[in-house]
Curated annotation (Swiss-Prot):
Transmembrane segments: 9-33, 44-67, 79-101, 122-144, 178-202, 235-258, 267-290
Gene that this polypeptide is encoded by: ADORA2B
Gene3D superfamilies per record: Rhodopsin 7-helix transmembrane proteins
Upper taxonomic lineage: Eukaryota, Metazoa, Chordata, Craniata, Vertebrata
Function, as annotated: Receptor for adenosine. The activity of this receptor is mediated by G proteins which activate adenylyl cyclase.
Entry keyword set: Cell membrane, Disulfide bond, G-protein coupled receptor, Glycoprotein, Lipoprotein, Membrane, Palmitate, Receptor, Transducer, Transmembrane, Transmembrane helix
Name of the protein: Adenosine receptor A2b
GO molecular function: G protein-coupled adenosine receptor activity; G protein-coupled receptor activity
Localization of this protein: Cell membrane
UniProt: adenosine binding residues: E173, N253, S278, H279
Pfam family, one: 7tm_1
Length: 332
């Protein structure tokens, strides 16, 4: 099958994004795994986010490329390819929400934070979030799908099914109904967490600014609060980028559902660009970590120097010293 120029460009860009996503997010996981200064509950949630982004590069993008080519396969195989992307997206959103709640607790109840948010509890929350993400992403398998309209399977008088009629052109819209994507996925599972995160970060900045205005604060407390503000800004930036990358796809889905006549004329390149933008969100986070966090930046440099450039140098904790900094200092 010969690809058109537009399809070939789309595939090439997807493969580039996949490579960058895998490399960058594996680096994030390795950094947290090798640096004691980065092994905090907050960063465990970021590792969960990075794991989802690695899976986007390894699986979701190849699946998306396969779906974009519109090959013919059985309905449920195509549905699985489509739903897998939804699982990873939902996991990313839940991980970002967990980070927001974690940062709010850190600045709202700083004296109780370490006893409330432990590594064990963080890992337990991550496990629950992934189970929920799979449940939400795989909901179309329970029946909320387009099988009746996408296939022409018939049950002859003898009770057998003509499997050749059950093949479907594997395109996302052919297997997942827009009613699910808009009402359940977007309005129910994507938009509410994003709005909750917006409220949480606004409250974080309000609480932090109010605390900074207290004249009786000692220098150490003021420094800790300033670090929390810096961390919150970085994490809010990640949430904002995630929203900007994913909202175009959901906007197109809304147009498809509510304005079907107009959606029929939508150019293919517009949908391809929206999909590319959504996948590009998986590349951004490691760049933000490296730019905004000294410990991540230092550890990235040490890992690359040792394992990529083969320079023999001992990998220390994020600041080049023993990992004795507080959890607040190693936040973004």
């Amino acid at each position: 099958m010969q690809l058109e120029t537009q399809d070939a460009l789309y595939v090439a860009l997807e493969l580039a994004i996949a490579a960058l996503s895998v490399a960058g997010n594996v680096l994030v996981c390795a950094a947290v795994g090798t640096s004691s200064a980065l092994q905090t509950p907050t960063n465990y949630f970021l590792v969960s986010l990075a794991a989802a982004d690695v899976a986007v590069g390894l699986f979701a993008i190849p699946f998306a490329i396969t779906i974009s080519l519109g090959f013919c396969t059985d309905f449920h195989s195509c549905l699985f390819l489509a739903c897998f992307v939804l699982v990873l997206t939902q996991s990313s959103i839940f991980s970002l929400l967990a980070v927001a709640v974690d940062r709010y607790l850190a600045i709202r109840v700083p004296l109780r934070y370490k006893s409330l948010v432990t590594g064990t509890r963080a890992r337990g929350v991550i496990a629950v979030l992934w189970v929920l993400a799979f449940g939400i992403g795989l909901t179309p398998f329970l029946g909320w799908n387009s099988k009746d309209s996408a296939t022409n399977c018939t049950e002859p008088w003898d009770g057998t099914t003509n499997e050749s009629c059950c093949l479907v052109k594997c395109l996302f819209e052919n297997v997942v109904p827009m009613s699910y994507m808009v009402y359940f996925n977007f309005f129910g599972c994507v938009l509410p967490p994003l709005l909750i995160m917006l409220v949480i970060y606004i409250k974080i900045f309000m609480v932090a600014c109010k605390q900074l205005q207290r004249t009786e604060l000692v220098d150490h407390s003021r420094t800790v609060i300033q670090r929390e503000i810096h961390a919150a800004k970085s994490l809010a930036m990640i949430v904002g980028i995630f929203a900007l990358c994913w909202l175009p796809v959901h906007a197109i889905n809304c147009v498809t559902l509510f304005q079907p006549a107009r959606a029929k004329d939508k150019p293919k390149w517009a949908m391809n660009m929206a999909i590319l933008l959504s996948h590009a969100s998986s590349v951004v986070n490691p760049i933000v970590y490296a730019y905004r966090n000294r410990d991540f930046r230092y550890t990235f440099h040490k890992i690359i120097s040792r394992y990529v450039l083969c320079q023999t140098d001992v990998l220390k904790s994020g600041n080049g010293q023993a990992g004795t900094q507080s959890a607040l200092d190693v936040g973004l």
